[in-house]
């Protein structure tokens, strides 16, 4: 079992505030289960000791209304979101925890746990990089669906693309 994580953030560094967390649990055939939560920006900054990047805020202002409006619904305190994600992930003990970039999703999420004196719910050696895989197999295109820059939609699309890479590129 593997998990693909996607974050929407207000920065690009390890101390970026997370404003949405999406995840897709998958095997070599399909996405089996999903997780999604929005996080209150004020809580992410105040409670999570995160730092907003003004350039990222300006970037978000240029994104589609559908992606931005989804972030305003059902926001939770950062610590609540982290506990809920831990409770969703921990029973599975995934083989790999994937993010779109070796220095983005997994690092930001792990660092958020640590800043709140919590242990990330996976071991660091399970970190995997989806961006590396898609770079190794550029001929295998993704069948993108859903709203771009929606953490759940992106996690599901990335997981499905990785499954396609495993099948077509690696013969798994």
Give the positions of each predicted feature:
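Non-transmembrane alpha-helical segments in soluble domains
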Residues: 68-69, 86, 110, 159, ...
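Short, function-defining helix-loop hinge/capping sites that tune catalysis or transport
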Residues: 14-16, 113, 162
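Substrate-recognition/cap helix-loop segment adjacent to the acidic, metal-dependent catalytic center
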Residues: 86-89, 103-124
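Conserved non-catalytic scaffold segment of RNase H-like nuclease domains
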Residues: 3, 8-99, 145
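Hydrophobic positions within alpha-helical membrane elements
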Residues: 11-13, 110, 134, 159
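Short intrinsically disordered terminal tails
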Residues: 1, 52, 170-172
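Short, flexible loop segments at boundaries between secondary-structure elements
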Residues: 121-141
């Amino acid at each position: 079992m593997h998990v693909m994580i996607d974050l929407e953030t207000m920065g690009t560094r390890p101390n970026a505030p997370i404003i949405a967390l999406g995840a897709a649990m998958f095997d070599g055939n399909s996405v089996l289960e999903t997780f999604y939560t929005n996080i209150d920006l004020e809580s992410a900054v105040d409670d999570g000791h995160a730092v907003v990047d003004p350039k990222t805020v300006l970037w978000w202002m240029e994104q589609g209304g559908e992606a931005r409006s989804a972030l305003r619904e059902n926001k939770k305190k950062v610590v609540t979101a982290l506990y809920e994600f831990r409770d969703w992930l921990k029973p599975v003990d995934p083989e790999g925890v994937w993010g779109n970039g070796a220095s983005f999703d997994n690092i930001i999420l792990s660092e958020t746990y640590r800043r709140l004196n919590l242990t990330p719910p996976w071991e660091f050696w399970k970190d995997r990089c989806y961006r590396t895989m898609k770079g190794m197999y550029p001929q295998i295109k993704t069948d993108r669906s859903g709203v771009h820059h929606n953490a759940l939609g992106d996690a599901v699309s990335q997981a499905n693309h990785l499954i396609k890479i495993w099948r077509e590129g690696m013969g798994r």
